[in-house]
Amino acid sequence: MKHTQSGQSTSPLVIDYTCRVCQMAFVFSSLIPLLLMTPVFCLGNTSECFQNFSQSHKCILMHSPPSAMAELPPSANTSVCSTLYFYGIAIFLGSFVLSLLTIMVLLIRAQTLYKKFVKSTGFLGSEQWAVIHIVDQRVRFYPVAFFCCWGPAVILMIIKLTKPQDTKLHMALYVLQALTATSQGLLNCGVYGWTQHKFHQLKQEARRDADTQTPLLCSQKRFYSRGLNSLESTLTFPASTSTIF
């Protein structure tokens, strides 16, 4: 009885703490990119680092290689412009690695919690193992979708650090990263839709199996498969988190 009362008294505190952490994470995730890129905009404009070059794509932020510094006006501070160029690349690569690791940690954590929840019921039937398999695939697909979206841009940044001169490979990566960097939401929706389709198939198979089973087996199967419907709402948080990143 004491354990139940203490659990009920601490539950609102835990919920309030979780809400505050989520609000702080939302605010910081909005402010940190602005704070990190403020030196690039401020110092870049005062030092005249960004302007229209002879090649149209060189005016894009973070895509002006050191070789383009020769086209800057005499009043431009080349040392500041070069420092801002490498600073922008470092921020981009660091954000990519941090976002990828965060997505993987959140999804693996959700996968672990769900496995503990299923195993706590004391029964692992065919449906439970099928759902666990879908969750495992989902944990792999979201990081793969994130890497497919931002991988070409990361490869382009790394190649430009080693070979600043523009080549045909650079132009191909320019076009590829322009297409993939804007398709993260589309790929996330594809992974989410595929997962929901698999859940729907499991429900259809459960209904077909129920038609060929005895009343006792039907009641047992309904009892042990109650967690299937609650899983869809439980896994919506990793989906929205991955889309935000």
Swiss-Prot record:
GO terms classed as biological process: signal transduction
Protein location: Membrane
Transmembrane segments annotated in the record for this chain: 24-44, 88-108, 141-161, 173-195
Assigned keywords, A-Z: Membrane, Transmembrane, Transmembrane helix
Recorded GO CC terms: membrane
Membrane topology qualifier: Multi-pass membrane protein
Keyword check for Transmembrane helix: yes
Protein name stated in the entry: Transmembrane protein 116
Gene name of this polypeptide: TMEM116
